[in-house]
Amino acid sequence: LDKQPTSRGCFLCGRQNDIGLKMNWLNDYEARQVWSEVIIPEGFNGYPGVVHGGIVAALLDETAGRALMLDGDHDGLFITTKLEVKYHLPTPTGEPLRVVGWVIKRGSRFARVGAEIRLPDGRVTAICEAAVARPPRKFFETCDWDSEKQYWKIVE
């Protein structure tokens, strides 16, 4: 299994984000999926012991989008244009979670991707489907991607 790149400031993967989760994603080429394991601490909860729904959505969104990097295209970035999340069970804080993402359909400019969060026993707490698109050049100017790109790398 190969690791995917991480960044410096991203809430989920940023290595220099003091309040971030510092997640890593792995490519499972045989299953055509990407996955990450994470324990979400209290402080990212909505109700006590339950991960906030917005954090759940962020986990799903990032993991679904990362499925597009399975073929090694780490520079062909996409942005989410629509995200539909179905919450099946409370996602617990303080317990190991596995977030899995996959590609549903991919084109050159648009794609549909999905992801789910699994408990150690395999039950799914939440699932998403997202529409993503290649961002226009203006997006990269707004986020100053050219100067940030140097921090987008695989960390061992």
Where are these regions (language model features)?
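A conserved, well-ordered hydrophobic junction motif at loop->secondary-structure transitions
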Residues: W35-L59
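Residue-level recognition of well-ordered beta-strand positions that form the cores
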Residues: E37-I39, E84-K86, V100-W102, E116, ...
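Intrinsic-disorder/low-complexity, polar/charged segments enriched in Ser/Thr/Lys/Arg/Asp/Glu/Gln
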Residues: A31-W35, K82, P96-R98, R112, ...
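HotDog/MaoC-like acyl-thioester-processing domains
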Residues: L1-K3, P92-T93, I104-E156
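A short, polar/proline- and glycine-enriched secondary-structure boundary/capping micro-motif
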Residues: G46-G49, F78, R137-F139
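Hydrophobic beta-strand-centered segment that forms part of the acyl-chain substrate-binding groove
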Residues: T63-R98, V103
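Short beta-strand micro-motifs enriched in acidic
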Residues: L26-D28, W102-R106
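Non-catalytic linker/capping segments at the edges of enzyme domains
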Residues: L1-G43, E148, W152-E156
